[in-house]
Amino acid sequence: MLKIMFNDACGLTNAVLKGNKIRTTRFEKMPDRYRHYLNVKQQGAIPYLINTYDEDTGLFTIKQCHPFKEQMEKFALFSPRYKKGETYAVAQPYKQLPENLKKMLNLKETDAGWNNKMFVKPAYMPWRIRILDVEIFPLYVYAGSEQLCLEEGIIKAPQPFPDNMRYSHISEVENVKYYHSYSNAIAGLFNEVCGRDTWKNHYNQWIVSYKFNVEQNIV
């Protein structure tokens, strides 16, 4: 089993475990041929192009569809990092695991994964996520969908904060950052997690978006 890591400084691991974050976005390397046809598809093409996900192979396929022919010509393939239906261990440093679990697994402060979750064993992790859906779309799609932003972990208050701010996310520098709109909030979150100006510099980039649910693992 493989593991998946979320940003701790911005509270994303905790958001996943609490069920407040049920979607994650990854900037993955796509073949040039695949990205080219994605852009052609976005602009509209006749014969038109279809981008589909095959659950059996775990591959995205772009096919050319001829309006007056039944057959479809396969143009390009892309294999996303995570596959629909599969489970992945949510990485946490050993020191954060429940005391009874640390004792049962005989974990010590000298273990490589005690402070660094990059070195933990997936089988020891008490939580899993199961991938429910895999999608490919440009990053800017988030700017037009409150639902997607909330699934990414953006928090919406029942009532506006002072200055009419209603959306927020945990920040590495500040405890919480507040925003007037969900689009500004998701832009701020991407900049926090992926680096300054990520939203502006990658606004038109195709990304892979994974929707998931969280499950407890019986170690």
Go through each PLM region and give its residues.
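Secondary-structure transition motif
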Residues: M1-V219
